[in-house]
Amino acid sequence: MKSFSPSTLVWIAVASQLGTAQNCPILGPAYPAVANLAAPKLTAAKARFEKALESINRTSTSFAVQVYSAHDDGLIYSTYNTATERVGAATVGPDTIWRLFSISKAITVYAFLAKLGDGYWNEPITKYIAELADAPVRDPIRDVNWAEVTVGSLAGQSSGLTRDYSLRDRSTVQTQIPGFRELKDSEIVQCEALRMIMKTYPWAPSYRTPNYSTMAFQLLAYAAENITGESFPDIVVNELFKPLNLTRSYVPIPRNETNIVNYPKEAWELDLGDLSPGGGYSASASDLSALGRSILRSTLLPPILTRRWLAPTIHTGTVWHSMGRPWEIMRHRVPATPASNVTRNVDIYAKQGGGGVYTTAIALSPDHDIGISVMTAGDETQAAFNTIREAFLDIWLGAAEEAARDLAEATYAGSYAAKTAGDNSSIVVGLSPGEPALFVSELISNGTDVLAFAVNDAGRGGKGGQFGLWLYPMGLVDEREKGKKRVAFRGWPGVVGVELEEACGSWAESDRLRWGNYPGDSYVFVVEGGKASTVENPGLGRTFWRV
C-alpha cells in the first residue's frame, strides 16, 4: 500500500477545494462576538445612528430604541423621543409601556418552548384540540384538513390557515356592505372561537407556503393549556415574566398604568381576548430588550433548543426573507470592512408588530450576539420605523462586524512556531484586507511550506492573488480550565480577491481530510488573558506557540 505523509494528505484534500478558490463564508459568524460594549467601533456607531435618525418627525412620532448585547446587562445604545402631538405619555423612557401587537407571537412561542420544549412540533393539533379532530373535510378548497396541521406549523406561519376569524370580518361591526352577499344570522361572526375557526377557509395546504395567521397562535395557546392544564396567561407569566423579572410586561393590557403610549385610546384598549397570544401583549422597551438578551444567552432554554429555534423553517417568495417560529428572518449583506465590496450574509431573527399608529419590533443577530428593541407610535410611525430598521441593519450590524474583526486581530493574529528543538514548523495568522475571517498566510510543517506545496500541486483554480486559509469560528469553546479557553476554528483554502459566487458551497467542501481520525482543517487556539498563546492543528499533530 502506498503511504503518504500527513502534509501531502492535507493538501490532497485542499486541492479538491480549489475549483473556485474563493472565500466562501460558512453560515454563522466570521469572528467570535465582541463582549466589550465600549469597543471603539460600537462607540463610533452611536453618532452615525443618531445622524440617521434626524430625518424622523419627532413632533408627531414617539419612539424608544435600545441596542443591547448578550454579554452585558447594560445597553450599547438607547434613545427616546416624546411626540408633542397626541402621545399619551408625559415622557417616553425605558419603562414606558407600549402595545407589542404581533411581537406577542414570539413571546407566545418562547413561553411554549420554556414550558414544553419543541418535542410537540411535529404532532397534529387534533391530538391536543379534540374539537378540530371532528371537523369534516368534504371540500379541500372549503375545509381545513386539521389532521395535517401540526403544532409546529402553527408556530411557524406554515399551517395553511387564514389570517384570523373575526378581526377583519366586517360582519362584526356592520350588518351589510353594499355589493356583498347578505348573511344569515348563523353566518355572522360571534365569539364562539373554535366553531368560527372551523368555519374558516384554508389558505393553502399546510407546509406549502407561509401565510400570516394570528389565530394560529390562539390554537397554539389552546394546545398548551390542554397539555398542561394551566391557563396560557399563567404560562407566559410564570415561564417568562417572573424568571426574567419583567415587571413592565403584561398579558392583559394594564388598565391603571399612566406611563403608557395610548394614542389613540381605542388602539390601546383593544381587547383581543383569546387572540391575545397573537397580538395582545404589552411591554416596555427595557423588558423587551431583557427578553431578547435572554434568548441570545439561552437563559431559559438549553443552548441546543435555542439553536433549533433560531433557524428557518420555510422560505418566502424572496431570497432575502425566510420564516421561523415565528421569526421573520431577514438576510442582510454585511461588508467585510467599510470600504470593501466583499460581503457575507447575516441572518437577522426579527418579529415585527403593528396596529393603528403603533409599529414595534424585536430583532436579534446571533452572529454578533446583539439585538434591538424598537417601539414607535404616531402619525408617521411607519416612516420612523423604517428609518430605524435600515439604520440598524446598515450601521449597527456593520459596527458589530468591525468590532469583532478588531477583537479577532488583537486576540489571534500573530506568528506562532513549534517549541521542539529542530522542528521547523510555524504559522502566521492575520487578516486579509477587505475579506471576512482570520487568514493564514504562512504554514510550515516540519520544514515543508504546505501553502506553496498545495498551490504548486493543485494550482489556483485559474485565479491570481495570494493563496492561504480562511479560519471561521465553529462555536465550539472549552472553558473547563480556569483562566483559559480553547476556541475551535476550521480552515477553508482559497485565493485573496476572488469574487464570491452565489453558488459557493463551503458547507459541502469542509472536513475532507482525516489522519488517524484527526481533522486536518481544524485550528484550536488557547486564549489566556485575552490573547491567544498557542494554536494546534490536530491533523498535523503540532502545537504552535506565539513568538
Swiss-Prot record:
Q: Which Pfam families match?
A: Beta-lactamase
**Signal peptide per UniProt:** 1-21
The record's comment on protein family reads: Belongs to the class-C beta-lactamase family.
- Which Gene Ontology MF annotations are present? hydrolase activity
Q: Does Phosphoprotein show up as a keyword for this record?
A: no
Which parts pass through the membrane?
none
| EC code | 3.5.-.-
Name of the molecule in the record: Beta-lactamase-like protein sdnR
- Where are the annotated glycans? 57, 211, 226, 245, 256, 341, 424, 446
Instruction: Outline what the protein does.
Output: Beta-lactamase-like protein; part of the gene cluster that mediates the biosynthesis of sordarin and hypoxysordarin, glycoside antibiotics with a unique tetracyclic diterpene aglycone structure. First, the geranylgeranyl diphosphate synthase sdnC constructs GGDP from farnesyl diphosphate and isopentenyl diphosphate. The diterpene cyclase sdnA then catalyzes the cyclization of GGDP to afford cycloaraneosene.
- The catalytic site is made up of 102 (acyl-ester intermediate), 212 (proton acceptor)
What's a GO biological-process term for it? antibiotic biosynthetic process
Q: Which SUPFAM superfamilies match?
A: beta-lactamase/transpeptidase-like
What is the top-level taxon of the source organism?
Eukaryota
Q: In which pathway does it act?
A: Antibiotic biosynthesis
The entry's keywords:
Antibiotic biosynthesis, Glycoprotein, Hydrolase, Signal
Q: Does the keyword Hydrolase apply?
A: yes
